[in-house]
Curated annotation (Swiss-Prot):
GO biological process, one term: defense response to bacterium
GO cellular component: extracellular region
Protein localization: Secreted
Species whose genome carries this gene: Rana temporaria
Tissue: Expressed by the skin glands.
Record bears the keyword Secreted: yes
Protein name: Temporin-1Th
Length: 58
């Protein structure tokens, strides 16, 4: 029983580390892809629907 708990704890620990590393890698890739021009397009996309809603009064 003790070895089973020990094994499960080890698997949980290794899985947590793996998820953490994957998340850091994903965040780094997103930062590399974000160029100033792309950021401007994203802001415009978010701004356009809100601007239309305010102009139309909905």
């Amino acid at each position: 029983m003790f070895t089973l708990k020990k094994s499960l704890l080890l698997l949980f620990f290794l899985g947590t580390i793996n998820l953490s590393l994957c998340e850091e890698e994903r965040n780094a890739e997103e930062e590399r892809r974000d160029e100033p021009d792309e950021r401007d397009v994203q802001v415009e996309k978010r701004l356009s629907p809100n601007l239309l809603k305010s102009l139309l009064g909905k």
